Regions:
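N-terminal secretory signal peptides that target proteins for export/translocation
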Residues: 1-21
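Sec-dependent signal peptide recognition
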Residues: 23-28
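Residue-level signal for mature regions of secreted extracellular proteins and peptides
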Residues: 31-32, 338
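C-terminal motif of bacterial Sec signal peptides marking the signal peptidase cleavage site
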Residues: 34-37
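Beta-sheet-rich non-transmembrane sensory/scaffold domains
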Residues: 39-729
Length: 729
């Protein structure tokens, strides 16, 4: 698997792990189950109940969500647990998983940001690259135009962020280090949000606790003559608790940064977004049900199916529902309470998965001293998340996904259900559900970019094959699907039927041409206004241009074939320029992946897209920051010029054993696009570190933790171990 990019290698390695801590671009255990909407509050702060309105009518299709009457949740869960027992499963999460969306793909947003009130106006700047303007995503480096907040690892090769630091920009463009705080060792943070006019940071991540159980809960009912030994038949600790962590940090100007309070929500983190001062966190909770599925102990016989089913009758709502806790800074104990009541959860009766999982949407007011919050939940899992400034869309599957022979396989013909929630501050309202053919793929960093809201319609690009591979060499020789990709347009019906109706699909009878060639996978998808751009790849890189101006009659208007592929498509320059940047990999005509490829496309003529220029950096095995997630690029629009910075690890040295290349240096590679002349220009590279020995590059800090931001005429490169390199552009 040496030719695979690191995100794909990690995905393969983790497909059989049901309870691993969520990591960037990782795979975690998820059951794909029934979905619904719930309300609830939290202890230790001001709870805002979701608004009470007219109850939705009974669903008219299996996709829609139905309200749960008292006792219905418990009955539903007991039914699912009995199904698991009948199937011979040994844990609630066995046999089902999905990708956590801890990271989603990157797209440029306007670089000019309004500075905090009461502070001297800093220059315009480019911070985290986002999918939607006005919808912030967590990242390890943020700036308000005057200060830089960074989260860093302690040593090269580490995978855990251990320090939060602040640096202040000086008049000459240099950085002055402020104070830093150590992050709790038991928490694994993914990134931070900046809110409340720069006065508060919200760090988001997870806390996973392991234990070696010493007692079998059903041992006394198995056999009175069984040995009482406590030796385990399995040598590995068991996950006993997974919680999403929200650490609120004071970041007022002129004060040292310091932790303010911490919230814990049962379940692992799917992803988070911030709109204005409201943090939205999506989490997913897999109850353990230890009485039903005890860890086997040496000397104790495994419980029979009848004994397991008897334990199911003793399951109660507190065993099902997640909790939330808040601990103010300096407090000795946290206040804990259920996140929701059982009657707050809704069900999707037609869901075929047997696993039990609750997914929660929690809104937190970061500007509120008491951290007022509200929650909605649904019974089921999530394998895709997209958020506009007004709505949150959660994509799910009603069928399980399994790993087999290095491939990921959807059972039967894959379909994706999409549930829409309206959001406005603390208000979270279920709006409706729809279903589309295909699925969002297996790469968690890209699933959100396969959805886009435009004029209240949701456009979705799905992948039609029931199996996927991680790299060209694993690609099957043939694929039955006629079109690798399907475009669907969904519209809320506006009535009482809580539906997202499919108003158009492509290909269709009128326009049957496939999107992609047989055997290809969907790599990059980018929606821009009334257009969509889709990249598929197996041996060459077809770029398709879709005209969505008439949502009832979408069409493919243009196609461009080049060597290699683009993992990400990023608009550059003014919209009128019609320019797009592609970042991915070069490849041979046989599909063998080579170095990092950066391409400038002219898509101003939808019928005739052109590749104006391209650069290939390094040999096979070279990586860019975008191989590790959506935030591995920084774009700054200055008039008709776009300044581009991408961390890269460049392989140029042939191994002493021959046959492959090893890392030569790690750096920030820079380009500039002139939208008037439509040119791509190289800028001097900021070298972070060079590798003297053959294996030194493999021991260096991961590109996953390298970033850059631009402020005025300066660029700041966060490199190895949290060290900044400041330079004029």
């Amino acid at each position: 698997m040496s030719h695979l990019n690191p995100r794909h290698r990690l995905a393969i390695e983790r497909t059989t792990q049901c309870h691993t801590p969520a990591v960037r671009y990782g795979v975690v255990a998820v059951a794909l189950l029934a979905l619904g909407a719930c309300g609830g509050g939290a202890g230790g702060g001001t709870t805002v109940s979701p608004p009470v309105g007219v109850e939705p009518p009974s669903p008219i299709s299996p996709v829609a969500l139905a309200a749960s009457e008292p006792g219905a949740l418990l009955s539903y869960v007991q039914k699912k647990l009995n199904q698991q027992i009948d199937q011979g499963l040994t844990s609630n999460s066995e046999g089902a998983f999905a990708f956590t969306g801890a990271l989603l793909s990157a797209v440029a947003t306007p670089a000019g940001v309004t500075p905090s009130s009461g502070v001297a106006s800093p220059p315009n700047f480019a911070s985290t690259t986002l999918q939607e303007g006005g919808v912030d995503e967590s990242d390890i480096l943020k700036t308000d135009g005057s200060r830089l907040f960074s989260m860093t690892v302690a040593r090269p090769g580490d995978q855990q962020l251990t320090k939060l630091a602040v640096h202040t920009r000086q008049a000459d463009g240099s950085l002055q280090a402020g104070n830093s705080i150590a992050l709790p060792s038991e928490d694994r943070f993914n990134g931070l949000h900046l809110a409340a006019n720069g006065e508060r940071l919200a760090l988001v991540g997870q806390n996973v606790k392991y234990a070696v159980p010493l007692v079998n809960p059903l041992a006394s009912s198995v056999s009175s003559t069984t040995s009482s030994t406590t030796a385990l038949t399995t040598p590995f600790p068991t996950v006993v608790q997974t919680q999403t962590v929200i650490n609120i940090v004071n970041s007022k100007v002129g004060q040292p940064i310091g932790s303010n309070s911490t919230l814990h929500i049962d379940g692992y983190l799917i992803d988070s977004r911030t709109i204005d001062n409201t943090l939205y966190v999506v989490t997913s909770w897999l109850p353990r049900f230890d009485d039903v599925f005890p860890v086997p102990l040496a000397g104790n016989a495994s419980p029979t199916a009848a004994q397991r089913k008897e334990a199911v009758t003793r399951v109660t709502n507190p065993k099902i529902l997640p909790t939330v806790s808040i601990k103010p800074d300096g407090a000795s104990q946290a206040s804990i309470q259920p996140l929701m009541a059982d009657t707050d959860c809704q069900l999707q009766a037609a869901n075929a998965s047997s696993a039990v999982q609750l997914t929660t949407i929690t809104a937190v007011n970061l500007a509120s001293p008491s951290l007022e919050r509200s929650s909605r939940c649904f019974l089921g899992g999530v394998n895709g998340l997209y958020m506009s400034t007004k709505n949150l869309y959660l994509a799910t599957s009603r069928t399980d996904v399994v790993a087999k022979g290095g491939s990921l396989i959807y059972g039967g013909e894959p379909t994706t259900d999409i549930h829409k929630f309206g959001v406005s501050g603390m208000t979270i309202n279920y709006r409706g559900s729809g279903s589309v053919s295909g699925h969002l793929g297996w790469d968690a960093s890209k699933t959100s970019y396969r959805m886009s809201e435009h004029n209240n319609d949701l456009r979705v690009v799905t992948y039609t094959s029931s199996f996927g591979w991680f790299g060209v060499l694993e690609a099957p020789s043939s694929v039955a699907a006629k079109s690798p990709a399907i475009l669907s347009v969904l519209r809320e019906d506006g009535g009482a039927t809580v539906q997202l109706k499919t108003i158009a699909v492509l290909p269709n009878q009128k326009r049957p041409a496939p999107i992609g060639l047989s055997g290809e996978q969907v790599y990059a998808v980018r929606f821009l206004g009334a257009r969509a751009y889709v990249v598929t790849f197996r041996r060459i890189d077809p770029l398709y241009v879709l005209d969505l101006a008439d949502p009832l009659d979408p069409k493919v208007t243009g196609e461009l074939k080049t060597n290699g592929y683009s993992d990400y498509l990023l608009p550059v320059g003014p919209d009128s320029a019609g320019l797009m940047l592609g970042v991915g990999k070069d490849a041979t005509t046989e599909g063998r992946v080579l170095g990092v490829k950066v391409s400038l496309f002219d898509v101003s003529n939808a019928a005739a897209p052109k590749e104006l220029a391209s650069r290939v950096i390094g040999k096979a095995g070279s990586l860019s920051g975008l191989d590790f997630g959506r935030h591995g690029v920084n774009l700054f629009n200055v008039g008709n010029t776009t300044r581009i910075a991408i961390p890269m690890r460049v392989n140029e040295t042939l191994s002493t054993s021959g046959g492959f290349y090893v890392p030569s240096y790690q750096s920030l590679v820079r380009f500039e696009v002139d939208a008037v002349n439509k040119t791509l220009t190289d800028k001097p590279t900021l070298v972070g570190q060079t590798f003297a020995s053959e294996f030194a590059g493999y021991l260096a800090s991961s590109l996953e933790f390298e970033r850059s931001v631009q402020i005025g005429e300066n660029i700041y490169y966060l490199g190895s171990q949290g060290r900044f390199t400041a330079s004029g552009w």
